[in-house]
Curated annotation (Swiss-Prot):
The active site is at H95 (proton donor). The keyword Transferase applies. It is an enzyme of class 2 (transferase). InterPro entries: LS (IPR034964), LS/RS (IPR002180), LS/RS_sf (IPR036467). Its EC number is 2.5.1.78. 5-amino-6-(D-ribitylamino)uracil binds at F27, A58, L59, E60, C87, V88, V89, N120. This is 6,7-dimethyl-8-ribityllumazine synthase. Belongs to the DMRL synthase family. Pathway: Cofactor biosynthesis; riboflavin biosynthesis; riboflavin from 2-hydroxy-3-oxobutyl phosphate and 5-amino-6-(D-ribitylamino)uracil: step 1/2. It holds the Pfam family DMRL_synthase.
Length: 163
């Protein structure tokens, strides 16, 4: 049975037709545009449809995800995966640490408790230059990375459901 649950690093389990939720924090609009572009490109390439929900900041992302997951389940059209996108830039106070740690913790809790494949694309940086390097699809493409993480976890979930 262990071999049946092992997958190659490049798992190609079909996820086309899946439905994803992207929740984005629009605190830094231009950076967010770049993160969203990367995530959308990855989901679209995999044949995954998506809905986008926009919230004011990173701390609101987990609550919006929980609300959307509940609504989708009640409607009979549950989401198969979730992508969280946002940007937190360090300032002069401990706000950075609070937002970074609490949003990440809440996302992990949601993913584990709800068994939902989730890619965390909330970038945490010291400078605007670091944010741009991480957000642009032509550079580090962290929006794309978050979508790929969600898709990888969805593939694992689907493969293990068949094992």
């Amino acid at each position: 049975m262990a071999d049946a649950r092992r997958a190659p690093l490049k798992d190609r389990t079909d996820v086309s037709g899946a439905r994803a939720l992207i929740v984005e924090a629009r605190f830094y609009d231009d950076i967010q545009d770049a993160l969203l572009e990367g995530a959308v490109a990855e989901l679209s390439a995999a044949g995954v449809s998506y809905d986008v929900v926009t919230v004011p900041g990173a701390l609101e992302i987990p609550a919006a995800i929980a609300i959307a997951l509940d609504a989708a389940e009640r409607s009979g059209k549950p989401y198969d995966a979730v992508v969280a996108l946002g940007c937190v830039v360090r300032g002069d106070t401990i706000h950075f640490e609070i937002v970074s740690m609490e949003s990440s913790r809440a996302l992990m809790d949601l993913s584990v408790q709800r068994r939902v494949p989730l890619g965390n694309g909330i970038i945490t940086v010291n400078t605007d230059a670091q944010a741009w390097a991480r957000a642009r699809a032509s550079e580090l493409n962290k929006g794309g990375d978050a979508a790929r993480a969600a898709l990888t976890m969805l593939r694992i979930k689907r493969r293990l459901a068949k094992a």
